[in-house]
Amino acid sequence: MVHHGQMHAQPGVGLRPDTPVASGQLPSTSIRSRRSGISKAQRETWERLWPELGLLALPQSPRGTPVDTRAWFGRDAPVVLEIGSGSGTSTLAMAKAEPHVDVIAVDVYRRGLAQLLCAIDKVGSDGINIRLILGNAVDVLQHLIAPDSLCGVRVFFPDPWPKARHHKRRLLQPATMALIADRLVPSGVLHAATDHPGYAEHIAAAGDAEPRLVRVDPDTELLPISVVRPATKYERKAQLGGGAVIELLWKKHGCSERDLKIR
């Protein structure tokens, strides 16, 4: 059980499947609502696997320390945080492709995490390099993730909040970029993808304005994590509609010998 700042982490019990977790002062995570409940089979899998693989992030007052990822995963390995993991298609595929990297999937709704748990159950949960957090990703970054601890942060297809009056709700604002940069290790990677041109411009401006982040070209630079991802349902939908997916990548200034060896 982990305490830190305004957050309290515990096994995910007692929540309705469509119950959002309270947000922090920074922009709340822009994850599309998943309003329908989970199935009986998903609930049974949840009850069996969640105590080992999951944490529930709730607002609380006691101070404490961030999640001990070494204890949680049972090893010392590079850690990637995926924000808005949805049903976990990308999460599982990328984790399987990089067994030496540990992945923490964060989402604000239980339904997607339940789908990911079922997918994990099908391939076998023993030794799986994935853990799950049900909660607001900004709160998790603030209170459950230590500074200089992540080799990567992935944000695939966050809600673009297209109306101008809703732009303040977008996840990837300058303040969030600064928080992500603080949590990345030197040479750690921020990988974002969107099919919304306006949001892509917004993300690009916010990332380029963060002094600790620098744009990278994955075709010419050695990165500590893979940036090859499977097509998501949102990407396929965009392609069918004639849209294009825009990939945005930055790395944190600085480089360590460990970072280059973990690939």
Curated annotation (Swiss-Prot):
Molecular function in Gene Ontology: tRNA (guanine(46)-N7)-methyltransferase activity
Domain of life: Bacteria
Pathway: tRNA modification; N(7)-methylguanine-tRNA biosynthesis
InterPro entries: SAM-dependent_MTases_sf, tRNA_(Gua-N-7)_MeTrfase_Trmb, tRNA_methyltr_TrmB_bact
Binding site for S-adenosyl-L-methionine: E82, D107, N136, D159
Annotated active site: D159
GO BP: any one term: tRNA methylation
Alphabetic keyword roster: Methyltransferase, S-adenosyl-L-methionine, Transferase, tRNA processing
UniProt-listed PROSITE patterns: SAM_MT_TRMB
GO annotations of cellular component type: tRNA methyltransferase complex
Membership in a protein family: Belongs to the class I-like SAM-binding methyltransferase superfamily. TrmB family.
Protein name as catalogued: tRNA (guanine-N(7)-)-methyltransferase
Organism: Mycobacterium tuberculosis (strain ATCC 25618 / H37Rv)
Organism classification: Bacteria, Bacillati, Actinomycetota, Actinomycetes, Mycobacteriales
